[in-house]
Amino acid sequence: LDMWSDCVARLCAAVGVTDDDVAQISFGYGLFTGALGLHYGLEKLGAAVIPVSSGNTEKQVKLLHDFGPTVLISTPSYAMYMSEVAHDMGISNDQLKLRIGLFGSEGCTNELRDKIEKGFGLFSTDNYGMSELCGPGVSGECYLREGLHFAEDHFLPEIIDSKTGEVLERGETGELVVTTLSKEGIPLLRYRTKDIT
């Protein structure tokens, strides 16, 4: 748990989350690693956490309004839906304190990112993780948003040709393969993610 929370804390700090922030986590708590990993990492960073979980969107929006979190954590599609519900409820961006969105668990196009940022008036970033590796904290964007930064002290990424297994050069498109460097319980060697990057 220390390694996991450290990786997530670094990911959050790289986008500007501090111990002055309050984060609303709108991922489901349970066996899904997203909510718990982000919760632990935010606490390690010193940020306060509102563990809302998923669903009941009008209540989620009311909490955004009433409690004033500065960070929203969810899937991009749910963040977009929440912004639409907030608009329908008559809640405008100037009534919210949101400044950062940490989104993951699904892909996010630039078009969707722009809509979320406009819909909530926040700055958003993407992150990547897999339950097999540790969940969130494997990699994420920093405030520059020029690509994902891997936690290379804990994970060794490679890109391979998915048909031949040949390691490809930097910048080529292929399948992401990851070796864990610090996991003790279930270490993985050249784990084929089936994710194309």
Predicted regions and their residues:
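Conserved ATP-dependent adenylate/AMP-binding module captured primarily in the ANL superfamily
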Residues: 5-22, 57-69
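Active-site glycine/GP-rich loop and adjacent strand/helix microenvironment
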Residues: 45-197
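Conserved AMP-binding/adenylate-forming core of the ANL superfamily
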Residues: 1-3
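Conserved AMP-binding loop of ANL adenylate-forming enzymes
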Residues: 9-41, 45-47
